[in-house]
Design a protein with these regions (language model features):
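Ferredoxin-reductase
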Residues: 2-92, 96, 106-109, 143-145
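C-terminal accessory/binding modules appended to enzymatic or scaffolding proteins
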Residues: 231-264
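A short, compositionally biased
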Residues: 37-39, 227-233, 271
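FNR/FR-type flavoprotein reductase catalytic core
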Residues: 3, 81-239, 245
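Local cysteine-cluster metal-coordination motifs and their immediate loop/turn environment
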Residues: 122, 261-283, 294
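Short polybasic amphipathic segments
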Residues: 42, 233-238, 275-277
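Single conserved hydrophobic/aromatic residue that forms the stacking wall/gate
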Residues: 287-296
């Protein structure tokens, strides 16, 4: 899948292992790259035709490069697997300019950052920014094994209140998110990024906290949660007058692309926001994840 007209052609400058099954990829261009803020992501258009969104982990002040952290997903459909097995330094890759759906509220009196697995990438970015601003913040990072905890050494350096939870060193016990949330002051802002079970635990724990103080970023599709929870529906296009039946087990994007409708998209999983469009009529339902899997 090629990028949009605003896509950048960047060179793969460096590929480096930073943890078990986690690579950091550095892209560089011929000139300064478009600016971004902590929590931003870029859509990477891979040579195999797949596009995926990855959080930027380098300092926004350094506009000479973009760096992303990519975990190897055993269920990969070609994104992380291609990067881990096929990407090489020197390749030219199309990348869309940064977008930010996980904005940091820099005015917060206190901030708590929680991450699981590769969800540490945008959290690491926020932690660096808060340290630069000399704000009060805590970081909780969870991983199954110490060898899989990406950026842990850097987080120890920038945050005096950094907590690393390793399941295998705690008799298999997961990070106690409800306890962390209960300990916070009323005006604390809370951020979380991680796999479905962690996100489910977090959203349950913050249910009574004002929405303006709760910030989440999903790295996985919600398709499993959606299946069986909503029925078929008709989708109408205002300009063309065309109408399509969207089955319960398909996404609107899939049906539109299948019928030759041009739609800006990237991850094709409802995560990155590239296909977001305006709804003129109808009611949308927010489907919450309920997936009792290991959280990282």
């Amino acid at each position: 899948m090629s990028g949009s007209s605003s896509s950048l052609k960047l060179r793969v400058q460096r590929i480096e292992w930073i943890a078990e099954d986690v690579l950091e990829i550095e892209f560089r261009g011929e000139t300064d790259l478009p600016a971004f803020t902590s929590g931003s992501h870029i859509d990477v258009h891979l040579p195999n035709g797949i596009s995926r969104s990855y959080s930027l982990v380098n300092d926004p002040a350094d506009r000479s490069r973009y760096c992303i952290g990519v975990g190897m997903d055993p269920k990969s459909r070609g994104g992380s697997r291609h990067i881990h097995t096929q990407l090489r330094p020197g390749q030219i890759i199309e990348v869309d300019p940064p977008l930010n759906n996980f904005v940091l509220d820099e005015s917060a009196e206190r901030t708590v950052l929680i991450a699981g697995g590769i969800g540490i990438t945008p959290i690491f970015s926020h932690a660096r920014r808060l340290a630069q601003l000399q704000k009060e913040f805590e970081v909780y990072q969870a991983a199954r094994e110490r060898s899989r905890a990406a950026y842990c050494e850097k987080l120890e350096e920038i945050s005096p209140m950094y907590h690393l939870h390793i399941d295998d060193e705690n008799e298999g016990q997961f990070l106690d998110i409800p306890r962390i949330v209960q300990q916070q002051t009323p005006k604390t802002h809370l951020y979380c990024c991680g796999p479905p079970a962690m996100m489910q635990s977090f959203e349950a724990a913050v249910a009574k906290i004002p929405e303006s103080q709760v910030h989440v970023e999903y790295f996985v599709a919600r398709s499993e949660a959606e299946q069986g929870q909503s029925g078929d529906f008709f989708l109408g296009l205002a300009r063309s007058g065309r109408e399509f039946l969207v089955p319960a087990d398909r996404s609107a994007l899939e049906v539109l692309l299948e019928n030759g409708v041009t739609v800006s998209n990237s991850c094709q999983e409802g995560i990155c926001g590239s296909c977001e469009t305006r709804v003129l009529e109808g009611t949308l339902s927010l489907i919450h994840i309920s997936e009792p899997t290991r959280p990282y």
